[in-house]
């Protein structure tokens, strides 16, 4: 599979700012078929982004979803709603959802199952906090997060991507080293192969956490890193383009 470079804008950009960004970013996009490019704007910008990205080769994704198709869930958004505006991907279990909004492994599991049932590709985010890393619990934390998220759907791992995002590196300007990332990515790959021996490398494992144009190339030198989930550095179209074409 092609390596995936994903932009997670988080709670940034109005509709007007989204239009300006995409108009600028598309000027930098050449041969998108050589890699998969994904932009995940806030919900209010999904419709206009979907229209502007049609036929460009750049994919559209959402930052979150609910596991039900419809109902009395004030403030939530369903997968069919996302698909109607062109979303092919959705980020599930981002550390900010886990730690700021209290999303549990059980809830994340429900979202993963719903994504698979409804035909949208989830990017499952996993990662350890600083104190867990210092206690030598990195692998245990990640194994638990992955196993709980994928319980009962292990045979469908080929339809899921995983983003390793060490919580201590997100938005701090202090990324994990490429060597740290490779070690964890290798662990995740081995775990996925244990859960589904037929996976055959179809689950891409991305790195996320203070990625920028200066360090992206160092991460992407390693075959164990199948892509990047980019936060702050994706908010500037030229900066994100440099990351996309850093390898």
Swiss-Prot record:
Q: What PROSITE patterns does the annotation carry?
A: TIM_1 (PS00171), TIM_2 (PS51440)
Q: Which domain of life is it from?
A: Bacteria
Reaction catalysis annotation: D-glyceraldehyde 3-phosphate = dihydroxyacetone phosphate
Looking at the Swiss-Prot or TrEMBL record, what is one Pfam family this protein matches? TIM
CDD domains (alphabetical): TIM
Q: What does this protein do?
A: Involved in the gluconeogenesis. Catalyzes stereospecifically the conversion of dihydroxyacetone phosphate (DHAP) to D-glyceraldehyde-3-phosphate (G3P).
Which PANTHER family does the annotation name?
TRIOSEPHOSPHATE ISOMERASE
- List the protein's name: Triosephosphate isomerase
Gene behind this chain? Answer: tpiA
């Amino acid at each position: 599979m092609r390596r995936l470079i994903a932009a997670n804008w988080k709670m940034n950009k109005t509709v007007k700012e989204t239009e300006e960004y995409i108009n600028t970013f598309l000027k930098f996009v050449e041969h998108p078929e050589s890699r998969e490019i994904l932009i995940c704007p806030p919900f209010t910008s999904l419709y206009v982004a979907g229209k502007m990205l049609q036929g460009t080769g750049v994919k559209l994704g959402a930052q979150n979803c609910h596991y039900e198709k419809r109902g009395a869930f004030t403030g939530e958004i369903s997968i069919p709603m996302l698909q109607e505006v062109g979303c092919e991907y959705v980020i599930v279990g981002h550390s900010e959802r886990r730690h700021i909004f209290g999303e549990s492994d059980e809830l994340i599991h429900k979202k993963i199952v719903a994504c698979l049932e409804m035909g949208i590709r989830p990017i499952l985010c996993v990662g350890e906090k600083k104190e867990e890393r210092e206690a030598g619990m990195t692998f245990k934390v990640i194994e638990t997060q992955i196993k709980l998220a994928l319980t009962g759907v292990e045979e469908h791992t080929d339809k899921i991507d995983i983003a390793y995002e060490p919580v201590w590196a997100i938005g701090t300007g202090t990324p994990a080293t490429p060597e740290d990332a490779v070690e964890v990515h290798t662990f995740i790959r081995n775990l996925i192969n244990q859960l589904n021996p037929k996976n055959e490398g179809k689950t891409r494992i991305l790195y996320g956490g203070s990625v920028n144009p200066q360090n992206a190339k160092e991460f992407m030198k390693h075959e164990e890193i199948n892509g990047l989930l980019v936060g702050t550095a994706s908010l500037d179209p030229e900066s994100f383009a440099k990351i996309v074409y850093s390898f």
